[in-house]
Amino acid sequence: MSVTVIVGAQWGDEGKGKITDYLAERSEVVVRYQGGNNAGHTVEKDGVQYKLHLIPSGILYPDKICVIGNGVVVDPSALLKEIEDLKAKGVEVKEDNLKISDRAHVVFPYHIKEDELEEKGKGDEDLGTTKKGIGPCYRDKTERIGIRMCDLMNAEVFREKLKKNLERKNKIFKDIYGEDGFDFEQIFETYREYAERLRPYVTDTSVLLYNLAKEGKKILFEGAQGTLLDLDFGTYPYVTASHPVAGGATIGAGIGPTMIDNVIGVVKAYTTRVGKGPFPTELKDEIGDFLREKGYEYGTTTGRPRRCGWIDIVMLRYAVRVSGITSLALTKLDTLTGLEKIKICTGYKINGKIIEDFPASLEELKMCEPIYEEMEGWSENIQDVRSFEDLPLNAKKYVKRLEELVGVEFSIISVGPEREETIVLRNF
């Protein structure tokens, strides 16, 4: 049995899409276990670019089984559009290769409206959400009023649950926000149509995954976002509403923790962040601009420019610890090409006191001054390099120094956006 979990080791946008695509080709089952269409990654295959938000990237391989787990919140409209877009590009999406958990919660228009109104009401203190209704959907799940895929498949159950929810939501829209609510019949009929279109894909994916694992299938779990956006372990409250850490795979897919063999942490060769929140190594100068433009650091889902900074070892050691990362995949090493000097944040200082562990307090994190170690850069184009030995000397020194500081070895190094622009240091 080989069960591998891929997690982002920073604030998301680490390049998990490419790494997942590479490993998906070598797996038999690919699973999403948390998040919704607030996440997104871009995969390039045979010169065609695919932007995926809900469906695992294994869908690009016709012989793989792709699973949307119970921990994912599903907007049926967004999912159906993604299916149609893939089919339009010649990708087969059918009940044999796409499975949706009957326990996954469903995103409704009122969730999206709640998201928008709540963010607007926070003014300058908004969290910078994608306004896709993800947080409000997870909140309904926690409040035990959420509607799941299995409910959507049963017209009578769905009718009763939607009716109760709309009465409650419409009252909130009117009394608190002075806004119009939603028409019951319109949502009911629209979502009944969605239900029939999605019905062939919906099943008990926990049983499916258990049986596949017992058969010895190679299973790959792909997390969305990153460790520092985790609801518990991220920079709260500037976090997502789910658990991108490796432990989230057990809850979000219904597999036991003892079934996980490997955890691969994906880390960019520098650091980026979308939206608000503290960022100790952020660069608000020409180097930050260089990284953003050369690395094309703009959100797949929102198009928002990402904040850029140097790599942060305190953060990476933290991610390794809370997810039990067994190896790392380094991405966008090529983006650093052309920089004369490259800095590595090896620790923080608060009022002269050295901080070695990532703080829980946002107030403390805001006060953290990065302690830097400077290394020589390189000017050679590395996109054609396929072995570690062929990298420029300073690039090799940089990678080796990161391994020493983090205490975990790299198994994959990405040197460009294309699938083949990859150095593989370990067989999977």
UniProtKB/Swiss-Prot annotation:
Positions that bind IMP: 13-16, 38-41, 130, 144, 225, 240, 304
Cofactor annotation: Mg(2+)
Note accompanying the cofactor annotation: Binds 1 Mg(2+) ion per subunit.
GO cellular component term, pick one: cytoplasm
Coarse class of the protein's main subcellular location: cytoplasm
Biochemical pathway: Purine metabolism; AMP biosynthesis via de novo pathway; AMP from IMP: step 1/2
Enzymatic reactions: IMP + L-aspartate + GTP = N(6)-(1,2-dicarboxyethyl)-AMP + GDP + phosphate + 2 H(+)
Subunit structure comment from the entry: Homodimer.
Protein name: Adenylosuccinate synthetase
Gene encoding the protein: purA
